[in-house]
C-alpha cells in the first residue's frame, strides 16, 4: 500500500502538506518532519493492498479542518464537500490504484488511532514523521517543504498587537500557549519553550485560532 502511495506523488516537493502528528511523551523529533502519508500495516502492506484492490475502494482517514490541506467547502455536500491539497492527493491515489476513495472525517487524535488499529487503510491529514510513529506505521516520504529544512519552517501565531512583545519562545513566560492535542507542535512546546504561564490543548487548529483571536490564548 505504501509503495503504491509513494508512486503517486508523496515524494514530490510540489505537493501540498503540513504537519500535525501524534507524538508520545519523551519522543524526540528527527530532522525529517515534513508532511507525508501513513498507511496501516496491521495486516501487512502487501495483504492490505490486495484487500483494497479486491474490494474496490480505499478508506482514508483525515481531519478536514486544516486548510489548505484538507477542509470543507460549504457550497458542496457529502464527500464532495471535502477539498484541499491532501484530498486531491487522496483522489490521485485512488485513480492510480483504480479504486473508489472513501474519506473518513474525524478528529486528529482519532486519525492516527484508526491506522494503528487497522480500522482504515490510509491517513492523509497534514502528518509528519516521528520515530515512534515509524515503529507502528508505514510512512511516505515528506512532500511539503521540498528542499527547505522542515525544522526551520514552523512558527507561532500571535495577535497583531502582540507582534512587538512576542518575538521568540523566550517571550512566553507569562503567556498562555495553545497547541493541538497530539500534534508535533505540542511536542515542540514541551521540548523548546522554556517557560509559559499556562498550556491549553485543543482538539482542532480552528479552536486554537479562535482562542488566540478572543484573547483566551496568546
Question: Which stretches of residues belong to each language-model region?
Answer:
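Ser/Thr-rich, Proline-interspersed low-complexity disordered segments
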Residues: 18-24, 28-32
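Acidic, polar ligand-binding/catalytic clefts
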Residues: 95, 100-171
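Bilobed "Venus flytrap"/periplasmic-binding protein-like clamshell domains
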Residues: 59, 64-67, 79-95, 127, ...
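Sec-dependent N-terminal signal peptides
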Residues: 1-3
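Extracytoplasmic small-molecule ligand-binding "clamshell" domains
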Residues: 26, 34, 38-127
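C-terminal motif of bacterial Sec signal peptides marking the signal peptidase cleavage site
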Residues: 6-9
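Bacterial signal peptide processing site
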Residues: 11-14
Amino acid at each position: 500500500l505504501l509503495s503504491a502511495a509513494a508512486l503517486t506523488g508523496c515524494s514530490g516537493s510540489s505537493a501540498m502538506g503540513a504537519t500535525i502528528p501524534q507524538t508520545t511523551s519523551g519522543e524526540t523529533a528527527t530532522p525529517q518532519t515534513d508532511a507525508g502519508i501513513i498507511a496501516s500495516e496491521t495486516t501487512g502492506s502487501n495483504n492490505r493492498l490486495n484487500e483494497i484492490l479486491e474490494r474496490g475502494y480505499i478508506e482514508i482517514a483525515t481531519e478536514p479542518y486544516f486548510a489548505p490541506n484538507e477542509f470543507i467547502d460549504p457550497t458542496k455536500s457529502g464527500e464532495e464537500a471535502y477539498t484541499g491539497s491532501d484530498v486531491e492527493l487522496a483522489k490521485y491515489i485512488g485513480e492510480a490504484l483504480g479504486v473508489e476513495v472513501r474519506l473518513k472525517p474525524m478528529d486528529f487524535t482519532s486519525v492516527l488511532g484508526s491506522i494503528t488499529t487497522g480500522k482504515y487503510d490510509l491517513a492523509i491529514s497534514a502528518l509528519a514523521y516521528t520515530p515512534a510513529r515509524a515503529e507502528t506505521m508505514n510512512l511516505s516520504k515528506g512532500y511539503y517543504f521540498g528542499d527547505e529544512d522542515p525544522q526551520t519552517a514552523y512558527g507561532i501565531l500571535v495577535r497583531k498587537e502582540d507582534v512587538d512583545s512576542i518575538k521568540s519562545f523566550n517571550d512566553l513566560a507569562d503567556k498562555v500557549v495553545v497547541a493541538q492535542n497530539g500534534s508535533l507542535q505540542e511536542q515542540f512546546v514541551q521540548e523548546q519553550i522554556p517557560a509559559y504561564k499556562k498550556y491549553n490543548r485543543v482538539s482542532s487548529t480552528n479552536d486554537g485560532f479562535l482562542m488566540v483571536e478572543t484573547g483566551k490564548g496568546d
